[in-house]
Amino acid sequence: MPDMANVESFDLDHTKVKAPYVRLAGVKTTPKGDQISKYDLRFLQPNQGAIDPAAIHTLEHLLAGYMRDHLEGVVDVSPMGCRTGMYMAVIGEPDEQGVMKAFEAALKDTAGHDQPIPGVSELECGNYRDHDLAAARQHARDVLDQGLKVQETILLER
């Protein structure tokens, strides 16, 4: 069996990072020379909790729009499988401070969101019944109350 490709997040020492934070997880260059940056938008300390599936699903729907409102070039905002945060792909290489400010603004929008959740119908969503706006808003408030920071990448010592 061939070796599996290296996955950046498996090299991160999850015991040494301090959530909540924004972290540049990597930059890829496309064959045409464009840069795509991946950011780790961490809500919870790894291995010390997880966001409920309905809440993280709602965060995904809200941050998909709100991050685009505050940061140019957002390609995608998706939940981490561990449910402690989101990954965001963005065209170019925005600086971490700018991403942090955009994330903070998007979290403020999320915390104050008092309208229907966007994209929540059988036509628009693959699991449209699984949402929790109140919990999503609370997670946004919790991160804002704790304060965001830029987290450096701390690699495992192997």
UniProtKB/Swiss-Prot annotation:
This is S-ribosylhomocysteine lyase. InterPro entries: LuxS_sf, Metalloenz_LuxS/M16, S-ribosylhomocysteinase. It comes from Deinococcus radiodurans (strain ATCC 13939 / DSM 20539 / JCM 16871 / CCUG 27074 / LMG 4051 / NBRC 15346 / NCIMB 9279 / VKM B-1422 / R1). The keyword Phosphoprotein does not apply. GO terms for biological process: L-methionine salvage from S-adenosylmethionine; quorum sensing. It comes from the Bacteria. NCBIfam families: PRK02260.1-4, PRK02260.2-4. Gene3D superfamilies: S-ribosylhomocysteinase (LuxS). Binds 1 Fe cation per subunit. HAMAP family: LuxS (MF_00091). Homodimer. Involved in the synthesis of autoinducer 2 (AI-2) which is secreted by bacteria and is used to communicate both the cell density and the metabolic potential of the environment. The regulation of gene expression in response to changes in cell density is called quorum sensing. Catalyzes the transformation of S-ribosylhomocysteine (RHC) to homocysteine (HC) and 4,5-dihydroxy-2,3-pentadione (DPD).
